Amino acid sequence: MRHTWVIATALCTLGLCVAIHAETQQPSQVLVMLRAAPPHLRAADDYAITYASSPDEAARKRIARELAHQYGLQLVDSWPMPALGVDCFVMRIVSGTSASDIAQALSHDTRVESAQPRQTFHTLAKDDPLYALQPTAKRWHIAELHALTTGKNVAIAEVDSGVDASQPDLDGQIAEQRNFVDDSGYRAELHGTEVAGIIVAREGNGVGIVGVAPQARLLALRACWQLADGSAASACDSFTLAKALQYALEKHVQIINLSLTGPNDRLLQRLLDAALAGHVTVVGAVDDTTADGGFPASYPGVLAVAGEHADVQRSDVWLAPAEDIPTTQPGARWNMVNGSSFAAAEVSGLVALLQELSPDLTLTQLHDALHARSALGFASMRPMTIDACAAVAQVSHRCTCDCGTTRASLGVPRR
Amino acid sequence: MLRTVVAVLVALFAVQARAQMTGSATLLSDYRFRGASLSDDRPAAQLAFDYDWAASGLYAGGMMSSARLDSRHAVQALIYAGYAHRVRPDFSWETGLRYTRFSGHEAYAYAEAYAGFAFRQLVGRLYYAPSYFHAGYPAWYAELNDSHALSGKWYAFAHAGYLRRGGDVMEYHASRFRSDFRVGIGLDLAPYNVQLSWTTTRGASDAVFGYPSAAGTTRNAWVLSISYAW
């Protein structure tokens, strides 16, 4: 047992070190955004090229090549971002100039809408399998909540590493898989599969666990990649995340789960603005090693979720179970996981339960439902633990779990 | 007319420094305009260019196309300019002006104004010409275009248009309405684009709307086109 602990600790440390190393490395690429004109009549509209998706794409590619040549860059990749009205071009820095200096210079070029370094993000799993089993479903009374709501048909985009859709608990639970990391095939990985299990694992199938929202439609968008075999530590970057967010917006998902963290990123902030403006609930995992909780959890409008025992000072952070969470792993395997990644996944599932009950739930109403209040009705000045039963009761206006407990949480005198 | 076209081209090149320019060359088996053949059911070649000032929403462009009017060869010159505004990521509107004339057939020159919207892949526009093909009466044209991505680089598209003319139509003993439809599939092999479509018209004949098409042109046609964009 002691031997296993040492190996697990070493693997965990190695994985985290790789992730941290990747994030602290100087970015070697920049993202250059060029404006895309709104669709409009074209010369040959009635004749031949009306229906091509973006006839002016060639013009932007030509400008991108000119920019790359002028600034000593190498054009690597591109991706349309209609949610922002831009095309995003990835350019590699071949000189010794820093990415931020080149991005700043490009930002002043009138052909360029905006530019920024391609930054690195990482997931927030602690990947420690040695804690004792302690089903979190019991704390949120999942089975009782499922009598009222299962998140049916609520679309959740899980922006993460790859999900194993053939895992017995996830078989038939994944609505769509997309790979935004590279051109190779979709790949099943640890962190993505672990997060997916917590959200949508099949209920009543005789194996494994129960997801918080087992009838939600999960879009498994692979924007992160596992750094080493056997470790959930994964990395992502501005470009892969932006592509996945853009796709989630195109698919009109109701919830986006971001169990990852990294530096503030202008492109991702703008995509989150577009999501929030479209009434999409964005759930972000808090990185308790940084003062502000890390991006995107620190971004206004994002539901920031930390583990119940996390040392966070912000009052707008929600706390959910983050230790000893049983969940799915690639293959027919299950394991215990720890980290705010999984607390965020639970909250994404809970939001799906609430949105099934009230599809027109506004962000304010959602905050009200999740936000436990003091006995006098004042909002708390500290991070508060989510009471899932109280939240469901508030949105459904029905008795759920233990009615007495629920009413106490709502500030209603217990009879 | 050549001087006008050259002047427009020079002006556009002069201000293109910060514009996004797209060009395309197209070969078609039949040049169908709102269902009417402007090439006498014969093949045609087209050269088009578009300028976008994406930050402001302004755009302009033009096209030169071979044509065959009244059984004689001609060159069509078309220019347009407009403004488009994106309201939401998947919804935008536009308005603009378009002017067309034909070499050796100046009597067919006309201008029209248009306004439209784009919602995802669905595009709708309403055109108004005070003197359609310079025939002395106004005409309205409404159209809807849609496209749908198929597997891989294939896509399907459809078009429906409805044309209504003003003025007296007694001499034609016909209605003042006409509709045209087009359905097809395309293959996007950037920078090449290949399309095969079937087009048809219903309602009044070409003569009622002053189209300069030769007598005997068909109402239905298969059209194959290949374009190269840069």
Residue ranges and their predicted role:
Chain B
Residues T26-D30, M63-A67, A84, R98-F102, ...:
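Outer-membrane beta-barrel pore domains and translocons
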Residues M21-A25, L58-G62, I79, W93-T95, ...:
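Transmembrane beta-strands of outer-membrane beta-barrel proteins
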Residues A25-S29, L47-Y51, A81-Y83, L97, ...:
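Residues on the lipid-exposed face of transmembrane beta-strands in outer-membrane beta-barrel proteins
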